[in-house]
């Protein structure tokens, strides 16, 4: 290959996030395909793509040049920011580049972008080559302004600090001022003997990608393409030009080309990838391996005393634990990971010592006895046949990876502790990148192209909302999208542009749980990224790249369920302490509690971790789990693979004796597999069983068996052929028939695809069981904790309040005197609604209220409440929300009176606060001790009707708490219905049942065949029922399919096999008005003689008038002390008896004097 004539030294990938269109690997591969031996990646103030760039470049035979584009601020230019590019000449330069990037984010945000200070440039100059930034750099700006003195000062700075490492950059991409700058620059270069270099400031691969890049920039900047104000900073010529094109472009300045090659030769950085660097763990001078052994043995002793309190039993069981511990310790120490285990041990122990709940384990880590001994996990791996080699395989070197669950509320405290222990500059969270996803990219590109919202919305709604959805998958999943694409040229154009942009890096954020702990400063391994305020620093390498770069990742995950358990125990244990009883230790509860398993078998698992979905409840009812092993199996079985393969049916039938148990198949089984498969009734359910079968039958080591399990998962034909031979040979050596061995191998291979990690299943089954146990033994406290965790999700709270009622628990409205921010439990065992769940109140006002209550005791009334709180924090709107929610019910006569008195109470309180602030002088100038108490006088107004009161609760709480909209109609509904919902029973096909209730959920769904079905849930306070409306019924009654309506529905009732309970197929649907017209014989109105005055009949006819032309006769009963007469109004006065009519008549005459008459 001949010597290169040009090398690209300024290329952006999509990691530049503002500009740059291409992913790093395709970019590098294109450079290699063009025959270029080197390239520089210079993303804007970041090295996010470095690991991918360095690895891909080496694999493609391209020399990677590491650099970045920067924005620079200096006294010379004041508020005007300039550009420059820095390339790492050597490893010192690479470190300085990393430090400059980190400083720009941590300390240098100006005008919403990371910026470096010129003084930092001097401090970190060693090993860096500077490209001047072309017309946007300091020299370029000064030249274009014609400021010769500024030009001289700038050149003097770079010649002083960068000597022969500063190049004037020349760019020819057809943008404004480029040629003017270029001529000036060449003159200056000659005058000051400065080298020049040609670049193309590449932001996309091909010229055709220009429009897509313009769209990307417009999305970021918030413009449409046609907006005349849109800045046009880019050119179609900023593509990856070939060497020949660049040579032709700069044929008149050959030294600019030659210098690009010269710079490429000067840049030689070696990045160490694929090694691991752990921080030093303090061991008090002991060898770290010995320290791990000591801690593990001490911990195992404690565990054995807990597991086997009887010394004789303990002595008998000890050898197998000691042997397993030694095997694991040998592997951990040989592989060089003792520090990893000790680091995890320390922060978990610190968490437990500081009352921060920690999960019992997660993933394959629960298979380690060392982890159990060090209290990293809380499940005995020998008891449940969990394998260490599934976690750490001595035959496949990779870092161990403990995922640790912490209470959501306190997880950040643990990260803060780790930063304190190892040094804040050595601990960081990890970056994660948001990309342009299928649905969002359609909306963004559509907006930028100026399409109407409706047009774009129609297309984006055809993309399913599933996680990981791509345009390619969407075309397969939704045929209508393909039809639209083929039929409409505008749609095709939009989608084609979206395809180019889909998957582009859009923004950076913080990974959910990843934390790295470095042996030295993080910046020795990766640059830092953070927000515009310099907060939340994260590594610029993502979770995979940061490990490749040598840093060890620890996953600090937040698990909401641990928070719920913690809150529940926070309610339970103080009460137990008060009663002189020992506290509940959740890690010590028995795993065979009969009451808990009875609730489980009845599928009373709403709010129980992992076991609360409809499908899971159905599986529980079929399986009837009666031991902890069955809960482990439940977690593993409830996945698409086992459910679709028939494995679940076999498992259930074998458990209940409907199918013979074989190990694993009645035709092909072996006695040695019985012990492995007995807990799962002969079904190969877990990955660990796959490994054990290979070990027992064919003599695999467990490390080798783990490799087999992985190979089976990947299904590579050559690898599988190799493994089959090894399996058969090993089996025959063990005296197993070769044909039988191959049949078992086939069965193992089949089920390996569905196999689940038992360690993870067991650890999470333990959390499931703990929540089940709490729900069983401390139901009020548990449900209060669950509702607190979900208080921001009104829909969920509504369902949980219903579950409380099903459990026989009382849920009281929020109460300003006995309530807390969270849901809590009063002395009578009733759940008090959390004040924090009231919509529109917020944490600040509640804190202020609780502070006033703690300081001065319970509030006496509304006036006392307003006088004692800080009205700047708790304003009138908040007080009104509290009244509507019922939180002030104990402070006044009724909600209507308090709402009418709010203004007076706030005014009086303001005067009271002013008097407090200035002091009160009496007429003789003597200061009194305190202002007078606020006078309490409620505005006299009638109490709200129940409907208004309940609507206030629904507005603020999201549900009806002190009543139900159905209540006032219960007597009337008996005239239309066959029974209440809780009395309904299945009917024959030719029979109908009529029920009524409030619609609490309604939707229309489309089946896979394209059929539309209406679904609604009726609630009459006695129970609920799912109602289906098929084809004709849906067409006829679609308008009634609306939430919060009271409907009367007739149809066939049957068992709901999927959800349990009953369901109805609707034949007729009526709202209350229609039902009244159909069933009511008349509207009875009683008028007393004393009620009649001169205006009475005018008011009476005024109320009836809007409701005439109905079908129900009006029967007026006139009553005086000595006689009663009935008068039926003429047919022209027949009415439609709506709620409005009935309410207005009741207000005029009285509640008991208006009612519907039925046969």
Swiss-Prot record:
Subcellular location: Cytoplasm
Top-level taxonomy: Bacteria, Pseudomonadati, Pseudomonadota, Gammaproteobacteria, Vibrionales
Organism: Vibrio cholerae serotype O1 (strain ATCC 39315 / El Tor Inaba N16961)
Gene Ontology process terms (BP): DNA replication
Cross-referenced SUPFAM superfamilies: PHP domain-like
InterPro entries associated with the record: DNA_pol3_alpha_NTPase_dom, DNA_pol3_alpha_thumb_dom, DNA_pol3_finger, DNA_pol_IIIA_C, DnaE2/DnaE/PolC, DNAPol_HHH, NA-bd_OB-fold, NA-bd_OB_tRNA
Family under the similarity heading: Belongs to the DNA polymerase type-C family. DnaE subfamily.
Signal peptide limits: none
GO molecular function: 3'-5' exonuclease activity; DNA-directed DNA polymerase activity; nucleic acid binding
Role played: DNA polymerase III is a complex, multichain enzyme responsible for most of the replicative synthesis in bacteria. This DNA polymerase also exhibits 3' to 5' exonuclease activity. The alpha chain is the DNA polymerase.
PANTHER family registered for this protein in UniProt: DNA POLYMERASE III SUBUNIT ALPHA (PTHR32294:SF0)
Reactions catalysed: DNA(n) + a 2'-deoxyribonucleoside 5'-triphosphate = DNA(n+1) + diphosphate
NCBIfam families xref list: polc, PRK05673.1
Keywords of the record: Cytoplasm, DNA replication, DNA-directed DNA polymerase, Nucleotidyltransferase, Transferase
Quaternary structure and partners: DNA polymerase III contains a core (composed of alpha, epsilon and theta chains) that associates with a tau subunit. This core dimerizes to form the PolIII' complex. PolIII' associates with the gamma complex (composed of gamma, delta, delta', psi and chi chains) and with the beta chain to form the complete DNA polymerase III complex.
Its EC number(s): 2.7.7.7
Principal place of residence: cytoplasm
GO terms under cellular component: cytoplasm
Protein's name according to its UniProt entry: DNA polymerase III subunit alpha
């Amino acid at each position: 290959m001949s010597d290169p004539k040009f090398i690209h030294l300024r290329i952006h990938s999509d990691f530049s996030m503002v500009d740059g269109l291409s992913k790093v690997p395709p970019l590098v591969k294109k450079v290699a395909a063009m025959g270029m031996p080197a390239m520089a990646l210079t993303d804007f103030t970041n090295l996010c793509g470095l690991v991918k760039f360095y690895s891909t470049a080496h694999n493609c035979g391209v020399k990677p040049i590491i650099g970045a584009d920067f924005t620079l601020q200096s006294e010379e230019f004041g508020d005007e920011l300039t550009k420059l590019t820095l390339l790492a000449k050597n490893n010192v330069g690479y470190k300085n580049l990393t430090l400059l990037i980190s400083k720009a984010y941590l300390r240098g945000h100006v005008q919403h972008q990371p910026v470096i200070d010129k003084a930092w440039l001097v401090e970190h100059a060693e090993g860096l080559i500077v490209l001047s930034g072309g017309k946007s750099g300091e020299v370029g700006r000064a030249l274009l302004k014609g400021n010769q003195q500024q030009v001289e000062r700038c050149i003097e700075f770079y010649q002083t600090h960068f000597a022969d490492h500063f190049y004037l950059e020349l760019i020819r991409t057809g943008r404004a001022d480029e040629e003017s700058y270029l001529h000036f620059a060449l003159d200056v270069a000659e005058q000051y003997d400065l080298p020049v270099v040609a670049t193309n400031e590449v932001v996309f691969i091909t010229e055709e990608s220009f429009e897509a890049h313009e769209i990307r920039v417009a999305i970021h900047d918030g413009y449409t393409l046609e907006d005349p104000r849109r800045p046009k900073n880019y050119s179609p010529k900023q593509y990856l030009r070939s060497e020949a094109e660049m040579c032709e472009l700069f044929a008149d300045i050959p030294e600019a080309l030659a210098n690009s090659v010269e710079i490429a030769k000067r840049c030689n950085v070696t990045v160490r990838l694929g090694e691991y660097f752990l921080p030093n763990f303090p061991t008090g001078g002991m060898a770290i391996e010995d320290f791990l052994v000591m801690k593990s043995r001490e911990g195992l002793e404690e565990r054995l005393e807990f597991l086997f309190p009887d010394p004789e039993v303990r002595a008998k069981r000890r050898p197998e634990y000691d042997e397993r511990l030694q095997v694991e310790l040998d592997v951990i120490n040989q592989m060089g990971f003792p520090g990893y285990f000790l680091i995890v041990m320390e922060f978990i122990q610190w968490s437990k010592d500081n009352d921060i709940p920690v999960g019992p384990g997660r993933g394959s880590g629960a298979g380690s006895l060392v982890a159990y001994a060090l209290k990293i996990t809380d499940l005995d791996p020998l008891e449940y046949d969990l394998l260490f080699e599934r976690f750490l395989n001595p035959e496949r070197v990779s870092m161990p990876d403990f995922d640790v669950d912490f209470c959501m509320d306190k997880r950040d405290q643990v990260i803060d502790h780790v930063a304190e222990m190892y040094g804040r500059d050595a601990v960081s969270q990890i970056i994660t990148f948001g990309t342009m996803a299928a649905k969002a990219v359609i909306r963004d590109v559509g907006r930028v192209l100026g399409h109407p919202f409706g047009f774009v919305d129609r297309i984006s709604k055809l993309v399913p909302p599933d996680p990981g959805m791509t345009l390619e998958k969407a075309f397969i999943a939704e045929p209508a999208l393909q039809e639209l694409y083929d039929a409409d040229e505008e749609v095709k154009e939009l989608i084609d542009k979206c395809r180019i942009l889909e998957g582009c890096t859009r923004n950076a954020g913080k990974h959910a749980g990843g934390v790295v702990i470095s042996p030295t400063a993080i910046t020795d391994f990766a640059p830092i990224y953070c927000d515009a305020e310099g907060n939340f620093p994260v590594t610029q390498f993502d979770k995979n790249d940061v490990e490749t770069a040598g840093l060890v990742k620890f996953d600090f995950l937040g698990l909401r369920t641990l928070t719920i358990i913690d809150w529940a125990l926070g309610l339970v244990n103080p009460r137990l302490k008060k009663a002189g009883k020992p506290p509940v230790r959740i890690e010590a509860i028995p795993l065979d509690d009969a009451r808990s398993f009875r609730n489980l078998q009845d599928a009373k698992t709403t709010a129980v971790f992992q076991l609360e979905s409809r499908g899971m409840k159905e599986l529980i009812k079929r399986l009837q789990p009666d031991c902890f092993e069955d809960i482990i199996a439940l977690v593993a079985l409830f996945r698409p693979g086992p459910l679709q393969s028939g494995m679940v049916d076999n498992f259930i039938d074998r458990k209940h004796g409907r199918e013979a148990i074989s190990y694993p198949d009645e035709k092909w089984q072996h006695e040695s597999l019985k012990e492995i498969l007995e807990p799962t009734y002969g079904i190969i359910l877990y990955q660990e069983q796959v490994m054990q079968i290979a070990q027992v039958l064919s003599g695999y080591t467990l490390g080798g068996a783990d490799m087999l399990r992985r190979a089976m998962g990947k299904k590579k034909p050559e690898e599988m052929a190799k493994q089959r031979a090894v399996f058969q040979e090993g089996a025959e050596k063990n005296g197993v028939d070769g044909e039988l061995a191959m049949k078992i191998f086939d069965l193992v291979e089949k089920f390996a695809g569905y196999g689940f990690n038992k360690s993870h299943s067991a650890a999470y089954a333990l959390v499931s069981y703990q929540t089940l146990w709490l729900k069983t033994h401390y139901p009020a406290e548990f449900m209060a904790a669950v509702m607190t965790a979900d208080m921001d999700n009104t829909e969920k709270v509504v369902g949980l309040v219903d579950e409380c009622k099903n459990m026989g628990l009382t849920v009281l409205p929020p109460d300003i005197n006995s309530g807390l921010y969270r849901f809590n439990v009063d002395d009578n065992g009733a759940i008090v609604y959390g004040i924090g769940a009231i919509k529109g109140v917020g944490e600040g006002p509640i804190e202020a209220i609780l502070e006033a209550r703690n300081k001065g005791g319970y509030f006496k009334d509304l006036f006392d409440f307003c006088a004692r709180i800080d009205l700047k924090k708790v304003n009138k709107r908040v007080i009104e929300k509290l009244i509507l929610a019922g939180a002030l019910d104990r402070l006044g006569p009724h909600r209507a009176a308090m709402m009418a008195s709010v203004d007076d109470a706030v005014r009086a309180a303001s005067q009271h606060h002013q008097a407090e602030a200035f002091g009160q002088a009496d007429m003789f100038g003597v200061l009194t001790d305190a202002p007078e108490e606020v006078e309490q006088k409620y505005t006299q107004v009638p109490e709200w009707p129940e409907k208004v009161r309940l609507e206030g609760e629904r507005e603020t709480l999201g549900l009806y708490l002190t009543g139900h909209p159905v209540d006032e109609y219960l007597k009337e509904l008996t005239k239309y219905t066959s029974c209440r919902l809780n009395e309904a029973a299945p009917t024959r096909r030719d029979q109908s049942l009529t029920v009524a209730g409030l619609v609490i959920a309604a939707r229309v769904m489309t089946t896979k065949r394209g059929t539309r079905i209406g679904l609604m849930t009726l609630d009459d306070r006695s129970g609920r029922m799912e109602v289906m409306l098929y084809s004709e019924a849906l067409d006829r009654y679609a308008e009634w399919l609306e939430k919060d309506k009271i409907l009367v529905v007739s149809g066939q009732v049957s068992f709901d096999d999927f959800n349990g309970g009953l369901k109805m197929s609707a034949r007729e649907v009526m709202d209350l008005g229609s039902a009244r017209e159909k069933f009511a014989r008349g509207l009875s109105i009683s008028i007393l003689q004393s009620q009649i005055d001169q205006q009475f009949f005018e008011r009476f006819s005024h109320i009836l008038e809007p409701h005439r032309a109905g079908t129900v006769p009006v029967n007026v009963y006139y009553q005086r002390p000595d006689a009663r007469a009935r008068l039926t109004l003429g047919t022209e006065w027949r009415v439609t008896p709506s709620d409005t009519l009935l309410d207005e008549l009741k207000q005029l005459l009285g509640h008991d004097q208006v009612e519907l008459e039925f046969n």
